[in-house]
Each structure stands twice: as C-alpha cells, then as structure tokens.
Amino acid sequence: KAVLEFFAPAIPKIDYPAWDCLPYDRVSPSPAVSAARMAALSLLAGARGAGPLIVITTINAAIQRTPPKSVIAASAFSAAPGETVSIEALTAYLAANGYTRASTVREAGEFAVRGGLIDLYPPGADEPIRLDFFGDTLESVRAFDAATQRTTKQLDGVKLAAATEVLLTEESIARFRAGFRSAFGASNDDPVYEAVSAGRKQAGMEHWLPLFYGETATLFDFIGDGLIFLEHLVDEAANDRSAAISDHYAARADDLSAPRSRNSEVSAPSYRPLAP
C-alpha cells in the first residue's frame, strides 16, 4: 500500500478485507470487517464514471460470496444539511441495514438516538458522525471523537452503506426459511433457523448467506472490466483456500451425520453446513 501511495497518491484506495472467522464457523465476521467490506462494495457499486479507484484485497476476500450488486446499491443512503430527512425513517433504515442501536456510539455499525440528534458510525469511516436535526430538517453533520464525544470537524453530508452482509427483510427471511428447509428438512430445533425466522440476528448466520438472496456475487462483479493485478503466488493461495473450505465443510458434515451419544459432553447444537 505504501508503494501505491508513492506512485498514485491522488487515486483513492479501498481496503477490502476477508472475513476474520473460519469457514463454517459458529461466529460471524467481526462488525469492523463486515462494515469495511460493505463500505467498499457500496462505493464500487456507485462508482461508475466517478474516476479511478484502487482496491487492495486478498484472494480469501475476493472469492468470498457477497450480496448481489442490486442489493448493495439499494442499501445506499445519502443526505446533506438543509435536506428533509425523517428521523423515524432514518432510524428504520439503520435498523434494517444491520446497524446496532446503542446508548453510546463507539464501534462501526452502531447508532444512537437522543432527541434531535442521531450518532452513528458508518462503515468505512474513520470516526463516528453526529446528525443534528431541527424537526425533519438536517441542520448539520459533524464528525466526532468516540472517546471524548467532542466534534472534530464539520462535514458536507453523510453517505451510508449497510453495516452487514445479511439484511433481514421479509423477503430475505422467507427466502432463507424456504432454502434452509429445502437443504436440511424441517429444522425447528436449529438456533439459526429459529432466530432468523423471528427476524433476529444470530451469530454465524452469514455462513448461510446464499440462502438469503436469489443470487450472490463476488468482488469481481463490482469491478467489472477494471484491471486486475495478481501476486505471483495467487494460484497457490486460491488452492489453499479452496482446500480449507472443503476440509471445514467435510468436518461439519461428518459431525452432523455422526451418532450423538446420550451422554455426550458436546452441548452445542448440530451445525447444518451449506455445501460450498
């Protein structure tokens, strides 16, 4: 990245990280990683004709399935001081797009509402921002320090992307339920199935991402005909990643089919892996 800064200082650079959890894990990628990925995809989805961009990534990140480009584009939101923005509508947008309501905003993907103020930490932002409303008029947008809560600078506006790769809407929940039952049969005892059916987030639900959308994409669908530069060991890295995914899937599948002893010390519920 330092080399790119030297040779192309004027071109914006986007970091696109891989999930920081194992394939078929019981935990989700961290909020910071999910936020960074969605911020990058949102920027790329709306970047046509906006000038050159450089995306810095890894093979693990590039081949990871994502929501379709249409979903990413539809989740974008922007506003500027002087515009009419309903606080209720904005709050609903944040909740629907994976932001977590908190009393005080400290991490990416969080938001807080206090009267005519909305604090939020947009994906990809260096600092959280504070939206100051008078009624339904957005009066100002300010960046602030999460530790001190003090304003650091005034901003011309706000651009938001979804904070998570799984958006729980009526449509996506219904699609997940149908796909899960088709793949694994009736699963009323599955914690992921139960939580999603109730419209709740569940740790690790991103590992069933294809069930939430009619189609999925990868980073390459957002780049289009852009130039791609590969490190010389990319084939080896891709093969290693594919092997790791296959190994983790096989381990989960074997565990699912293995008989469970009544006296088994394994208390975790069965994990129903989606084939890669």
List the model feature ranges, each with a label:
Residues 1-276:
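ASCE RecA-like P-loop NTPase motor cores
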